[in-house]
């Protein structure tokens, strides 16, 4: 009987209930809300679902993640394995045809980076260091892979928070975007259908990633690992002779592309 009592006491002492805090409860509630948005409201379920469930798991005390799953994930990030793989998949899913046909659309992408500077200024105003603010600022561009990559370089201690913030922001774009669009456009403007100006040849689509990689990498060598993988994935897609590599990059590597 005494042995049974000792066993029960051991189970109680090792349980997570004794270490459970108000903060854990709040974050688990946040995770459950995100799970609802992902699966009930279908807000980017492939992206938000794993993040939300991970949020729940991470806030269960004494879960053993740091020695197990998290150790593998942290190694993949710190050794810069996951970000290039993510960019390989993104490149394989990207069609640069509209950009090649109408280079002026590049300005739209440049304008999107305004969010980076807004987030950067906000972080600086809140007292973060220049390096921390720069890592946080990338969240404003809604770019998860780049946020992770830059955080590992400039503010590794903020990596978890930055990754979750960036991917949550990306997942909630379908919720945030409609009211903003309605605020700045009319119904008639929203009904305009964009058409590609001309048909882009296969030769152009193959040459573009090669030339872009060489020129931009010479201009900014530090981004070669990410840019090179992005353009390699696109080359797999557009060459027409590497279907298996393209399919793997787009689908089998989805686990890397979707999770921070």
Q: Can you say where each PLM-predicted feature lies in the sequence?
A:
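N-terminal alpha-helical transmembrane segments of multi-pass membrane transport
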Residues: 1-68
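Interfacial helix-loop-helix linkers and transmembrane-helix boundary segments
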Residues: 39-48, 70-73, 94-108, 242-250
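Membrane-embedded hairpin module used as a gating/binding unit in multi-pass transport
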Residues: 165-242
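Residue-level detector of conserved catalytic or cofactor/ligand-binding positions
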Residues: 256-259
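Alpha-helical membrane segments and immediately flanking helix-loop junctions
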Residues: 75, 79-80, 87-93, 108-118, ...
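Re-entrant/interfacial helical elements at transmembrane boundaries that shape
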Residues: 49-55, 102, 134-138, 145-156, ...
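Structural signature of hydrophobic alpha-helical transmembrane segments
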Residues: 16-27, 71-86, 132-138, 167, ...
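Alpha-helical transmembrane segments of multipass membrane proteins
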Residues: 32-37, 89, 117, 121-122, ...
């Amino acid at each position: 009987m005494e042995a049974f009592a000792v066993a029960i006491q051991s189970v109680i002492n090792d349980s997570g209930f004794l270490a459970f805090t108000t903060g854990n409860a709040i974050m688990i509630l946040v995770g459950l809300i995100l799970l609802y948005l992902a699966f009930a409201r279908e807000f980017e379920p492939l992206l938000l679902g794993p993040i939300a469930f991970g949020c729940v798991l991470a806030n269960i005390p004494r879960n053993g993640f740091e020695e197990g799953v998290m150790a593998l994930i942290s190694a993949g990030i710190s050794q810069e394995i996951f970000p290039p793989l993510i960019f390989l998949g993104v490149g394989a899913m990207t069609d640069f045809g509209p950009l090649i046909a109408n280079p002026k659309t590049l300005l739209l992408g440049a304008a999107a980076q305004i969010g980076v500077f807004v987030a950067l200024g906000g972080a600086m105003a809140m007292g973060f260091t220049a390096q921390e603010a720069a890592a946080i600022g990338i969240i404003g561009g809604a770019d998860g892979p780049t946020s992770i990559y830059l955080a590992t370089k400039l503010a590794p201690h903020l990596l978890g928070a930055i990754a979750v913030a960036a991917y949550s922001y990306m997942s909630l774009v379908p919720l945030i975007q409609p009211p903003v669009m309605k605020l700045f456009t009319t119904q008639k403007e929203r009904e305009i259908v964009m058409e590609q100006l001309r048909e882009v040849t296969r030769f152009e689509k193959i040459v573009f990633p090669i030339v872009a990689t060489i020129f931009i990498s010479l201009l900014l060598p530090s981004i070669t690992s990410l840019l090179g993988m992005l353009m390699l994935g696109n080359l797999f897609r557009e060459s027409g002779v590497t279907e298996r590599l393209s399919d793997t990059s787009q689908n089998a590597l989805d686990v890397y592309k979707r999770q921070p």
